[in-house]
Amino acid sequence: MFSGALNYMKGLVGTNENLQVEESGDNKGDIEPEQRKGLLKQLSSYVGKDITSLISLPVWIFEPVSFLQVMSEPLQYNALLSKASKQDSEFLCLAYLAAFNCALYSTAVRTRKPFNPILGETFEIVDKKGEFRFLAEQVSHHPPIGVSETISEDYTLQLETLLKSKFYGNSSEVEIDGTNHFFNKKTNHHYTWNHLVTCCHNIIIGSLWLDHYGDLVIENHTTGSKAVLKFAKSGWLGAGRYGVTGEIVDCEGDVRYRITGKWNESIQLFQVMDNGSSSTTSTCLWEASKEPINNKFLFPRWVEENVIDLNDEYKKILPVTDSRLRADRIALEEGNLDVAAKEKHNLEEKQREDKRQRVAENKEWETAQFKKVDDAKFGYRWNYCGNYWEEREERVKAAASN
């Protein structure tokens, strides 16, 4: 979906806080030779394989967030989703959904891997401005699947991420299976979109850099209109890198708008005239933030304030399953690497022991907040069917009375 795949990929190769996944003339993207040798030794037996769940990585390459927390990071672009929902035109709704999907990839600056969620782990965000609420749950460990639902007065967004990664020697690819569902409450239109391929180049030799490529299709299943975005694969010497082009077409296949730009800079929208040519003027749908990032882990301010923050109020109302409360995450954020490594090991061993217990008792894992249901059109969907928010309200009331 999303930036989560980027951070997962970068975590497979990130080794220190100074590592930048970008081309560089001053070697700031390089890994130390001894670290590369160790990485090569670890990965050499996995060439051509899905390594998502095969490798146990040392704690020093992690960032102090769980992948469920990373799943929430697209909501820093909630304004684009709200703007999409408020459009009278289905084509302009598609345009802002396209901008949202481009914006996700603009934050590819972090080089560490998020922690793998524990089965049954949850994460919530209740927006401080009251614009939305977000809930995610890790519903499967093998394969690793996280699902989430975001609800606002304008839309409902359902996400599913099933990561698959393959190692090819000096590069590695991450693909995400799963369909994202967007429901526009103003028009009652139902949209879906897929994911891109993310490739990390020069894992062993050269300066690390990321590429995101493929076709991203956003479809309006109510009317049949769609936006088709083409993320260019970087060519020789970086030709075409970051480029995005696209078209928004109606149910008859006629082009109504064209999209162009770079996913790390800005996205422009051009209306198509009756003669098929593009308008000479454009609308800027989105422009990358130039806000400086000054913290150790390269978290944007929005992430610091909404994803990482664990204040006294949260401690009183969060369930024990929330990602913020993971002991390994907290220790890592505080710089206690030895404690973080120990707590990470304890969590993983507890998860293995729980699985052995279920196998011995012939029991299947039961999700708490989301259920996989049959869907005639999409095969299946993950629907929220828990009582998380009701229980949260009770915890809030209890905390207020103390």
From Swiss-Prot:
The keyword Chaperone does not apply. It comes from Dictyostelium discoideum (Social amoeba). One of its GO terms (molecular function) is phosphatidylinositol transfer activity. Pfam families: Oxysterol_BP (PF01237). This is Oxysterol-binding protein 8. Belongs to the OSBP family. The gene is osbH. Residues 328-361 form a coiled coil. It comes from the Eukaryota. Transmembrane segments: none annotated. GO terms for biological process: defense response to Gram-positive bacterium; phospholipid transport. InterPro entries: OSBP_sf (IPR037239), Oxysterol-bd (IPR000648). Keywords: Coiled coil. Gene3D superfamilies: 2.40.160.120, 3.30.70.3490. GO terms for cellular component: cytosol; endoplasmic reticulum tubular network; membrane; pathogen-containing vacuole; phagocytic vesicle.
